[in-house]
């Protein structure tokens, strides 16, 4: 039974109402510093920890709760007579409920004007110590680190005469250890990122020790293949607009491959400023287009490769309305992603309950790192978020691209970044015409992209081509020109750039170098 609670929080969301409810249930309240003042100002009967222990706060508040009368009351096992006798001998009442959250270290170091001294002062000592003590003794003590659990605790107390069951205490204790691990991980990441100057402004992007925290969203039926087990975890620092923030409106459970392909589709489509549609199959775009609205963009994207689009993942960067929904509903689709779906669109898919509809708010946030596991290690790099500015583009051929060709080239370049290397992408009039992906030689990707367009009945005459990396020889260029391309955009940087540029001039096409490579593996 909970008779006494100690409350000390930095995040004061809902704390006054929670404390009032505890007081109404007859629970004695202990508190510290600003939290105690807040509760007292709200008219609640609260005892300062300094008065409770008989020892004042000291060292600018660094020492407040590090006292036997606090930790003895938390750590004592109620089932051990010798523990209870020790409490009685030293006049230490039990503390049955601990409500603590920590100094805002992560928020502090995120500030541009943060100094190392600011960071150090926001490393909580007493809070984690109390939390770990209470979590260790969760058999007898309820510990709350998340304001979202206030209502859960109150409901159970009211239903059980101020008592909390073991299952709830255990769950809350595991949240504490996850929270303190994340907190210590953030401190370690920060301190080990400091360079020799030991200044906040001179931090390295890659700390000497890397700690990351993820919460499990769900177990998955299986992994990439049926014999593999899998689960999906959400980054606790997931940025705005990230796939992990999806809301599923209908459909079967997402699979491992659904999630991976959905991420590829969403990351690509949200880079466009105008209505766009991206169709993904096996992590590669098989159709990308912009249009007047979602329905128009989908119709164009689907034309690129109707065969591969079967059972694909489709993403939009605008609301899916009834017209777009009716067009998509004619095909077999695994997942449909958009910032929103109109009520009429939802009605269209109500009859297709296996189709997974995901809503994700548009946002331009990116993961802090791109990660790739290797045997016994982890490759960590910054995101490939480089957008080439017009001033960085170099026309290296005698012929300049026309305004239309320039638009087509920039569209193709945007798409090529999301195609597995080696990537060749034919585009025209705001849509992909042929995509060659994942080949060991660039010339084979060029041939495949050309064949794909041919199979779809699309003409490549006057098309624009993007290559994610340089042409090592002129053969790839010869293939795309023979297919009908009149302009090419590529990074450049080959030992044979001069030979490739000369070939472009020989063919009378325009070529632009970006100076940026977009390998994707």
Curated annotation (Swiss-Prot):
It catalyses: (6R)-10-formyltetrahydrofolate + 5-amino-1-(5-phospho-beta-D-ribosyl)imidazole-4-carboxamide = 5-formamido-1-(5-phospho-D-ribosyl)imidazole-4-carboxamide + (6S)-5,6,7,8-tetrahydrofolate; IMP + H2O = 5-formamido-1-(5-phospho-D-ribosyl)imidazole-4-carboxamide. Coiled coil: none annotated. Signal peptide: none annotated. The keyword Chaperone does not apply. GO terms for molecular function: IMP cyclohydrolase activity; phosphoribosylaminoimidazolecarboxamide formyltransferase activity. Pfam families: AICARFT_IMPCHas (PF01808), MGS (PF02142). GO terms for biological process: 'de novo' IMP biosynthetic process. One of its GO terms (cellular component) is cytosol. Residues 1-145 form the MGS-like domain. The keyword Hydrolase applies. Keywords: Hydrolase, Multifunctional enzyme, Purine biosynthesis, Transferase. SMART domains: AICARFT_IMPCHas, MGS. The IMP cyclohydrolase activity resides in the N-terminal region. This is Bifunctional purine biosynthesis protein PurH. It comes from Burkholderia ambifaria (strain ATCC BAA-244 / DSM 16087 / CCUG 44356 / LMG 19182 / AMMD) (Burkholderia cepacia (strain AMMD)).
